[in-house]
UniProtKB/Swiss-Prot annotation:
Residues 297-332 are mitochondrial matrix. This is Cytochrome c1, heme protein, mitochondrial. The gene is cyt-1. SUPFAM superfamilies: Cytochrome c (SSF46626), Cytochrome c1 subunit of cytochrome bc1 complex (Ubiquinol-cytochrome c reductase), transmembrane anchor (SSF81496). It is an enzyme of class 7 (translocase). Belongs to the cytochrome c family. Keywords: Electron transport, Heme, Iron, Membrane, Metal-binding, Mitochondrion, Mitochondrion inner membrane, Respiratory chain, Transit peptide, Translocase, Transmembrane, Transmembrane helix, Transport. Residues 1-70 form a transit peptide. It is a single-pass membrane protein. Residues 71-277 are mitochondrial intermembrane. GO terms for cellular component: mitochondrial inner membrane; respiratory chain complex III. InterPro entries: Cyt_c-like_dom (IPR009056), Cyt_c-like_dom_sf (IPR036909), Cyt_c1 (IPR002326), Cyt_c1_TM_anchor_C (IPR021157).
Length: 332
């Protein structure tokens, strides 16, 4: 009787304990589901707030510092036609005869207004001029020497280490001689303009005889559809037969423009031949190294990629109790 009473009390305590555990589990699951339902809402609110702050910051920045304006074809200028320049090909170089003709066009036409302040006389040797021609050309100009004992600066003939002289003493003199417009330096003009050689060639050959109907040209400007705004201070400078080439090449407008553009491209990038040679060497070496790396990878990892793994679990012996039961039954 006492044993039954103890057993009943134990069952009652166990059932109460299970009920309490289930209630606690149910309440915990309810809380977790509520938290899970609230967490996406909080994340969405936080994401929306962060997006609003970022968009507001960008809008405020552009309100303070940004400037947006519509661009018309007349304001932007016509896009230059793409021309097949030979020196832009991978395995081609400059035409040295064209460089010599282009330098002649620059000296006789462009040098009166535009400078080449980054090109020394020594860079012309072996590419455009001989050593004697470059020395004679340098000696035609005078350069300042170092101050002497009395502090006076004297003049000396130019040397190969000197740079091509500027046509004006300073920017103010250049603006005064060109109605307020400052002629740009042509040392890097090909690299500094969108379109490069195509743009410079189109600009030099794009002057019409008369502005088209409806085109407005400001005072002191010339119409050129390739220049942004179509109004340029530089007038047309290339005409047929303007230059007498030494090699007898007909000096048409397009020929002179082509030669001077190729010369200006060389002036902006005289190391183009070295760069192309270095690029070819890099491509050859990297190709060989890549082929070797592929071979070594396949050779080293072939055994790992071709191996087969078979799962063979160990077989466990039958339990000893199963073997002993028949013997016990036989004895009984």
């Amino acid at each position: 009787m006492l044993a039954r009473t103890c057993l009943r009390s134990t069952r009652t305590f166990a059932s109460a304990k299970n009920g309490a555990f289930k209630f606690a589990k149910r309440s915990a699951s309810t809380q977790s589901s509520g938290a899970a339902a609230e967490s996406p809402l909080r994340l969405n609110i936080a994401a929306a707030a962060a997006t609003a702050v970022a968009a507001g910051s960008i809008a405020w920045y552009y309100h303070l510092y940004g400037f947006a304006s519509a661009m018309t074809p007349a304001e932007e200028g016509l896009h230059a036609t793409k021309y097949p320049w030979v020196h832009e090909q991978w395995l081609k170089t400059f035409d040295h005869q064209a460089l010599r003709r282009g330098f002649q066009v620059y000296r006789e036409v462009c040098a009166s207004c535009h400078s080449l302040s980054r090109v020394p006389y020594r860079a012309l040797v072996g590419t455009i001029l001989t050593v004697d021609e470059a020395k004679a050309l340098a000696e035609e100009n005078e350069y300042d020497t170092e101050p002497n004992d009395q502090g006076e600066i004297e003049k000396r003939p130019g040397k190969l280490s000197d740079y091509l002289p500027d046509p004006y003493k300073n920017d103010e003199a250049a603006r005064f001689a060109n109605n307020g417009a400052l002629p740009p330096d042509l040392s890097l003009i090909v690299k500094a303009r969108h379109g490069g050689c195509d743009y410079i060639f189109s600009l030099l050959t794009g002057y019409p005889d008369e502005p088209p109907a409806g085109a407005s040209v400001g005072a002191g400007l010339n119409f050129n559809p390739y220049f942004p705004g179509t109004g340029i201070a530089m007038a047309r400078v290339l005409y047929d037969g303007l230059v007498d080439y030494e090699d007898g090449t007909p000096a048409s407008t397009s020929q002179m423009a082509k030669d001077v553009v190729e010369f200006l491209n060389w002036a902006a990038e005289p190391e183009m031949d070295d760069r192309k040679r270095m690029g070819m060497k890099v491509l050859v070496v990297t190709s060989v190294l890549f082929a070797l790396s592929v071979y070594v990878k396949r050779y080293k990892w072939a055994w790992l990629k071709s191996r087969k793994i078979v799962y063979d679990p160990p077989k466990s012996p039958p339990p000893a109790t199963n073997l002993a039961l028949p013997q016990q039954r036989a004895k009984s």
